[in-house]
Regions:
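Conserved glycine-rich cofactor-binding loop
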Residues: 9, 16-18
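Conserved glycine-rich Rossmann-like NAD(P)H-binding loop of the short-chain dehydrogenase/reductase
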Residues: 32-46
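The beta1-alpha1 cofactor-binding region of Rossmann-like NAD(H)/NADP(H)-dependent oxidoreductases
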Residues: 41-42, 63-74, 102
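Conserved NAD(P)H cofactor-binding loop of Rossmann-fold oxidoreductase domains
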Residues: 89-93
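Substrate-binding pocket helix/loop in short-chain dehydrogenase/reductase
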Residues: 96-98, 104-109
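A short, exposed helix-loop element centered on a Lys and neighboring polar residues
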Residues: 120-121, 165
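Catalytic loop of short-chain dehydrogenase/reductase
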Residues: 136-159, 164-168
Length: 168
């Protein structure tokens, strides 16, 4: 199936494994050049090498923590003109509501809501100016049907979903 995105440039966050890697591979198979991001350099570089070898597209790997301004700046500097943004983040871990402290919520919000919003705000204006762009936010079915032990994830991912619904 031709998605009509060959030659486009995509940023894929948390792309060294799991859903992020799957998204990166699907975009590469469709002919997109990629900027991959994850915190772990070794796994990220291996993913980038695997995708380059298999799909023959340009792949840049940026090992950085996207939840920090510095990490986002590194990714955005490498990214240049972006057509597609895939926001993705792992975690936060399951647990009991009675065990979560404010810092647990802040970490969950940073990774699963605030960093994606910052990436959207950084990249979407240029997409709008060019008249073309796509944003994919990997969240969870728990934004519609919360899961008890995933309260940190439920709240942060639902916040991102609400933000996007309010801006689209």
């Amino acid at each position: 199936m031709d998605l009509g995105i060959k030659g486009r440039r995509a940023v894929v966050c948390a792309s060294s494994k799991g859903l992020g890697r799957g998204c990166a591979e699907a975009l590469a198979a469709a002919g997109c050049d990629l900027v991959l991001n994850a915190r772990g350099a070794e796994a990220l570089e291996q993913t980038a090498a695997d995708i380059r070898a298999k799909y023959g597209v340009n792949v840049e790997a940026v090992a950085a923590d996207i939840t920090t301004e510095e990490g986002r700046a590194e990714v955005l500097k490498a990214a240049g003109e972006v057509d597609i943004l895939v926001n993705n983040a792992g975690g936060p871990p399951p647990g009991m509501w009675s065990d979560w402290e404010r810092d647990d919520f802040i970490k969950a919000l940073d990774a699963n809501m605030l960093a994606p919003i910052a990436m959207i705000k950084a990249l979407v204006p240029a997409m709008m100016d060019r008249g073309w762009g796509r944003v994919v936010n990997i969240t969870s079915q728990s934004v519609k049907a919360p899961i008890g032990v995933l309260g940190l994830s439920n709240s942060a991912r639902a916040g991102l979903t609400g933000y996007v619904a309010g801006t689209s």
